[in-house]
Amino acid sequence: MNKVLLFFAALFTCVGVYAHDYKLVIPEEIPSEARTLLTQRFTQMLQGGGHAVVEEGTPVNVSFEILDRMETPGSMSQVALNIVVKAVCEGVKAEFPITGVGEDEADAWLRAVKRLLPRSKEAQKFVQELK
């Protein structure tokens, strides 16, 4: 058990240090696993193939808007989320529409954030405008 906790502590520390250069500002309302993955996705996006797109310490504000939330009742209930993730960096704005369906809201968030691809058309456009 201690080894597992130590592994996750090291993982979160590495992710935090890795993304700290960009000062990602992510809302606390997002479940922790989804927030960690969101940090990884934006870090990958902003590194643009191994080269930093923005200078160290540049703030990147990430917000979200839940467009739709649906829940199916019953013993096999699921939650579906339609979300728009909004990013602002150096005056450049981008919106990334994502959806996720999961067993609960945290799972739906995680599945939605997995669909935020660092090399998507929206991400590439955001990175090009930052350069």
Q: What do the PLM-derived regions correspond to, one by one?
A:
Residues V17-Y22, E28, S32-E33, H51-S63, ...:
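Generic structural signal for short, solvent-exposed loop/turn connectors between secondary structure elements
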Residues M1-N2, V92:
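Generic cytosolic/nucleocytoplasmic N-terminal low-complexity/intrinsically disordered segments
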Residues K3-L11, V15-G49, K125-K131:
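A structural "domain/chain start" motif
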Residues N2-A10, A87, V101, E105:
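Generic alpha-helix initiation/capping and coil-helix boundary signal
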Residues G48-V53, P59-T99:
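Surface-exposed short loop/turn segments
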Residues P31-T39, Q78, G102-L110:
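Solvent-exposed, acidic/flexible segments
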Residues K93-K131:
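C-terminal/domain-edge helix-coil "capping" segments
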